[in-house]
Amino acid sequence: MAVTLAALVERFGGELVGDSARSVRQVAPLDRACADDIGFVSQSKYLAELATTGAGAVILPPDARDATDLPRILTPNPYLYFARVSALLNPPPRPAAGVHPAATVAADAEVAADASIAAGAVIGSGARIGARSVIGANSVVGDGARVGEDCLLHANVSLYHGCQVGDRVILHAGCVIGADGFGFAPNEGRWEKIPQIGRVLIGDDVEVGACTTIDRGALEDTVIEEGVKLDNLIQVAHNVVIGAHSAIAACTGIAGSAKIGRHCTIGGAAMIFGHIEIADGTRISTNTLITKSLPKRGTYTSALPFSEHEVWQKNAVHMRNLDKLVTRVKQLEKRLNELENKT
């Protein structure tokens, strides 16, 4: 697929400088781009690459208008513009509508005529699959579950009974939506299972990465609001609420009944304690442990930066002796005060 720069500007806006008839076929990084590619620069430190790039055109911020003679589109947010161009040039493959002969669909399930159900997929009793949605190979949509319009469930997704997915949702391979939450009552040294009778409710325009698990609620529902983006290998426990348009990176764990606000960003491998609330717009750095509520919007970090092993060992020894050091400092302060009082 080839598209002219003029067509891109007509579709996405921006200011075009140079040859409007120049066609591009693909997006590419500046250092590997060829004449049929369009690249982008969103940070000034990369402007020097414009001198050597083979790209046929570039996307730049307005203040970089004169940084190159290449045909260019000027826009306040080059990264967003690049994303939209990439989506235009790389449309996802669309399987044919219909139910594969090797799929299993319950007699009372409702599947839109233009939906696609792949081989090995199972659609349970009373389940509903919306218009133009795609259910990948060997995926399971449980009894009474709902999948909205224009959704994509990749291969081997499990959507448990009663759970609901909004419109334009993407669930990547290996997702498990609606498994039982980790609920057990102690009884004389043993554990008795607590039925998890809530659901998982996923809003519109959500994307969930591969092998991420979202547990169903114990009594109330686990809720993923609209526009949330979850990376791979995330654990979302029962009764969690993740606010709209928050983004969470891989390997993060969120314990039960935590409430994460809207427009939050959480770095990879962060750990969130249960039964706490995090304010809208909060940023949490990678590998950070959040042990209590964050009522104030801000950026929070708890991870220690790396060091050479020998240096780390020495610092670890100092950490273990902090109590002794604090005691010695207090004793010294006391003696200094006594000396000052005598004089």
Curated annotation (Swiss-Prot):
The keyword Transferase applies. CDD domains: LbH_LpxD. The keyword S-adenosyl-L-methionine does not apply. It catalyses: a UDP-3-O-[(3R)-3-hydroxyacyl]-alpha-D-glucosamine + a (3R)-hydroxyacyl-[ACP] = a UDP-2-N,3-O-bis[(3R)-3-hydroxyacyl]-alpha-D-glucosamine + holo-[ACP] + H(+). GO terms for molecular function: N-acyltransferase activity. GO terms for biological process: lipid A biosynthetic process. Pathway: Bacterial outer membrane biogenesis; LPS lipid A biosynthesis. InterPro entries: Hexapep, LpxD, Trimer_LpxA-like_sf, UDP_GlcNAc_AcTrfase_non-rep. GO terms for cellular component: membrane. The active site is at 238 (proton acceptor). Catalyzes the N-acylation of UDP-3-O-acylglucosamine using 3-hydroxyacyl-ACP as the acyl donor. Is involved in the biosynthesis of lipid A, a phosphorylated glycolipid that anchors the lipopolysaccharide to the outer membrane of the cell. This is UDP-3-O-acylglucosamine N-acyltransferase.
